[in-house]
Amino acid sequence: MNLESKGVRLVALASLFGLAAISSVRADVPTDLRLDLVAMSRLPTQAQRTSALSNLLPRWVAVDLDTARLTVENWPDESARPMLLGETAWYWGERDVRAALDWAKGLRLENERYAAVRSAIRRFPYEAAREARAEVLRLPAGKIRDKVAEQLVEEFHRGREAAEWCAAYPDAIVAPILVRKVTRSWILTAFVKDANLNAESELIEEWAFELSDIRLREAAFAGALDGFCRLIYYPRPCREPQPIRRLLRYIDDGVLREQLTSEINEAWQKKFPDDVGNPTTVRK
């Protein structure tokens, strides 16, 4: 088959492997990419074809989005399809995040929709965090929206504004989960930026005490403690017992307080085995 001839269509062995969409690749697609697509269609196993497609997607989406998208939507390996759809949304979102998100929201299966929506939402830049959060709330209520919200909070949403959004999240079960994640991220980010951790902890406490819902308040304190616990394991470990002791005193739930105390002490003893003390003892 002469790939250089005008108007050529990639047929190769595509139809045998459920890759019929490849036969619609535009003639102006670079020859090297078309050759790679033919080579992909000739690979002997589905796993090999899936891996090859994943590697080709950045180039393919950039020059022939419609055919790439159609191929991924109809990919015969159902277990790999969410991953491929997520990658397609990611590469598409680099140049048009809203178009990628609209496409992702229209996918048929829930696991595929989630993978693509998650990737598209992640394409919003840090400066557009408020816009990204607004897009999350435009998603239909349910598992996909909740999981995407958790991912956003974990990845790049920090500080009081993000915390307030988490506290106001329109699901009473999910909101405390988001609050705990956002205050954890708040502490971790403060550490990376060499901020005063005691002062940052006080900002979290100040905000948390404004919350009327005790579940959200305790989640805020617990998240900050999760952050301090994680920092103990850092290469440049945090040794700030004062905010840890203070935050523990604010938690009324005895079971939660004991759990956090145990986790922090265990982390401390692993990191500092020669330290006879621990960071959770409240000194009077």
Q: Which residue ranges define each predicted feature?
A:
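Bacterial N-terminal signal peptides
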Residues: V11-A21
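Non-catalytic all-alpha helical scaffold/repeat segments
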Residues: S24-K284
